[in-house]
């Protein structure tokens, strides 16, 4: 089994949008005009996702999507630069928003949801290739993969703001980092 076929969390996050592949999610997000904000400071990516995803298939509601978008825009403005995210950067930030929200809101539910998804994921895998269920202690680790030149340093700065937003009053943060 290829590495990219084992990305359960990625597959789970895609399923929240009612799609089974990254290509399916991004097919209508690649236009550079979507890198702008509307008059209410919502990204045009948000509108495209909200308007084009099939309502009956997606598991993330429009209010949650709006909240995540508002957080991304707010954190981006905090950087004090005119940053225009490419679709893959925006989705990276959006996936982190979703994960952190679920993690800090209800870790047990996140664990249950991931393992339920993993059991279904494993039905198409044979023998030794089957993936083991997540453990509670593994949920505090999140790995992102972005290509060379994709703005990882800038994304990481926003990821820190995202973490601080969701962790506020929930965990003691080691300030030495």
Predicted features and spans:
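N-terminal helicase ATP-binding lobe
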Residues: 1-177
């Amino acid at each position: 089994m290829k590495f990219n076929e084992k990305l359960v969390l990625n597959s789970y996050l895609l399923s929240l949008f009612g799609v089974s592949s990254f290509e399916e999610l991004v097919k209508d997000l690649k236009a550079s005009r979507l890198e702008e904000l509307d008059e209410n400071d919502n990204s045009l990516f948000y509108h495209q996702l909200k308007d084009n995803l099939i309502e009956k298939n997606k598991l993330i509601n429009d209010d949650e999507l709006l909240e995540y978008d508002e957080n991304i825009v707010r954190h981006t403005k905090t950087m004090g630069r005119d940053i225009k995210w490419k679709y893959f950067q925006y989705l990276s930030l959006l996936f982190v928003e979703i994960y952190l929200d679920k993690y800090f809101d209800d870790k047990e539910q996140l664990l249950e949801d991931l393992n339920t998804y993993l059991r279904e994921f494993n039905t198409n895998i044979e023998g030794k290739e089957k993936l083991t269920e997540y453990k509670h202690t593994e949920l505090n680790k999140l790995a992102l993969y972005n290509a060379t030149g994709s703005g990882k340093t800038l994304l990481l700065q926003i990821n820190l703001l995202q973490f601080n937003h969701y962790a506020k009053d929930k965990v003691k943060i080691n300030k030495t980092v």
